[in-house]
Amino acid sequence: MNDFPALAALTIHDVKNRLNLLVQHAERKGDTEALRLAMEAAATLTRLLQAYKAGTGQLRAQVDAYAPADVVAELAAEFRAQSALRLELELGEAPVLAYYDEALVRMVLQDVLYNAMRHARAAVRVSVRTVDGDLEFSVADDGPGYPPDMLGVPAMAVPADGSGTGLGLYLARHVAELHANGARHGEVSLGNDAGAVFRLCLPL
């Protein structure tokens, strides 16, 4: 069936919308566990839909001026509503405005924060700053860190196991690549330093 990928994408979109309704219902009921599970499921479906678009060349960056500190503060509020982990924000070096696709960057950071929420022992740190002409978003946790095989994954490798972390990383690298300034493109880097460290760098 030649139209199956498009049909699957439409189905994912529909189910994601239904899950968003479930999220709203859980919020009204104050059911934090149901809220967390529904939001994770909705985020996974969003990644699948965006992965389909990336694989078919339909994913585009809609770049405009945004305040990086604002999106981080909004995601921090969501994080704190779902987790007892300590969340530290380092926004003092964040530029007032920067040009990027806010929706795509939000999706990437939300996914990374969900992973940090699952693996951190006690704390997660999020920072935004400018480094060598790039806008850098960094998320670090105090968990076990990234496994060695993930640190060596090729830049645009498609996750063979369909894992949430692998799919999120695949999308993050596509999102980074969509942001360009001349010959310079965005990059994603992973590292371990007392836990996992994720960096998304976008050229300014």
Stretches with model-predicted labels:
Residues 86-96:
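Conserved catalytic submotifs in the C-terminal HATPase_c
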Residues 123-133:
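Short beta-strand/loop element within the Bergerat-fold HATPase_c
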Residues 141:
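Acidic ATP/Mg2+-coordinating residue in the GHKL
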Residues 162-174:
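Glycine-rich phosphate-binding loop
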